[in-house]
Amino acid sequence: MNTLLDGIDWEKHPLLPAIVQERGSGEVLMLAYMNQEALNLTLSTQVAHYFSRSKGRIWKKGESSGHIQKIHEIFLDCDSDTILLQVEQVGVACHTGRKSCFFQKVELDSSLSLTSEAPDTSALYGVVDRLYHELLARQGADPQSSYTAKLFSKGENTIGKKIVEEAAELSFAIKDSSESEIVYEAADLLYHALVGLAFRGIHPDKIKQELQRRQGVSGIAEKNSRKDS
């Protein structure tokens, strides 16, 4: 470990604020928090990792959206209790789709205005990760507390049956229905598929990795490779 970082008193400051700045432009992108594990992961991978106070876990920036932050330099302030990361931002930093989380400008007359920068909707793909972790939180909950908790309590057979039902409804919608109805049914199918993944403890990132593996591989070759194995 870098001797400078050894000077951090983690017992006194278990979570350090981390200011994230874009390399080159100097624009401040976001503020997050790091514990010791997150900082060690950031150093070892050269990609920003943080500690989510709401989820109570380590998360890699861009783990769902792909909007990772490649580390170029790390600085500590004079009291060794605040971190500054200078990064190369892939895509956007803010979950709203904007480049920076600091897009609400407070005018000197105390009024609040928004910058005109339009959000990049590709950042919304992070909703899958958020939904997955919300589903995990429903496991073991009172079955009467929510539809999802009731599904979990009934087990894999009921979950599997619902996935089949939703797939059929999407198929019929694609054949006969409007775009809005197709989107609605596709969302239902994805939701129930995520319930199934959560039931088995499989993170959606594994599906993304599998899809990425298949890129550039013909469907016929991919199916044949499964038969061979």
From Swiss-Prot:
Pathway(s) per entry: Amino-acid biosynthesis; L-histidine biosynthesis; L-histidine from 5-phospho-alpha-D-ribose 1-diphosphate: step 2/9; Amino-acid biosynthesis; L-histidine biosynthesis; L-histidine from 5-phospho-alpha-D-ribose 1-diphosphate: step 3/9
Keyword terms: Amino-acid biosynthesis, ATP-binding, Cytoplasm, Histidine biosynthesis, Hydrolase, Multifunctional enzyme, Nucleotide-binding
One GO term of the biological process aspect: L-histidine biosynthetic process
Alphabetical list of InterPro entries matching this protein: His_synth_HisIE, HisE, PRA-CH, PRib-ATP_PPHydrolase-like, PRib_AMP_CycHydrolase_dom, PRib_AMP_CycHydrolase_sf
Region listing for Phosphoribosyl-ATP pyrophosphohydrolase, in residue ranges: 128-229
Enzyme class: hydrolase
Localisation per UniProt entry: Cytoplasm
Coarse class of the protein's main subcellular location: cytoplasm
Residues annotated as signal peptide: none
GO MF annotation terms: ATP binding; phosphoribosyl-AMP cyclohydrolase activity; phosphoribosyl-ATP diphosphatase activity
UniProt-listed Enzyme Commission number(s): 3.5.4.19, 3.6.1.31
CDD domains associated with the record: NTP-PPase_HisIE_like (cd11534)
Regions annotated as coiled coil: none
Catalyzed chemical reaction(s): 1-(5-phospho-beta-D-ribosyl)-ATP + H2O = 1-(5-phospho-beta-D-ribosyl)-5'-AMP + diphosphate + H(+); 1-(5-phospho-beta-D-ribosyl)-5'-AMP + H2O = 1-(5-phospho-beta-D-ribosyl)-5-[(5-phospho-beta-D-ribosylamino)methylideneamino]imidazole-4-carboxamide
GO cellular component: cytoplasm
Segments of this protein annotated with the region Phosphoribosyl-AMP cyclohydrolase: 1-127
Family stated for the protein in its record: In the N-terminal section; belongs to the PRA-CH family. In the C-terminal section; belongs to the PRA-PH family.
Name this polypeptide is given: Histidine biosynthesis bifunctional protein HisIE
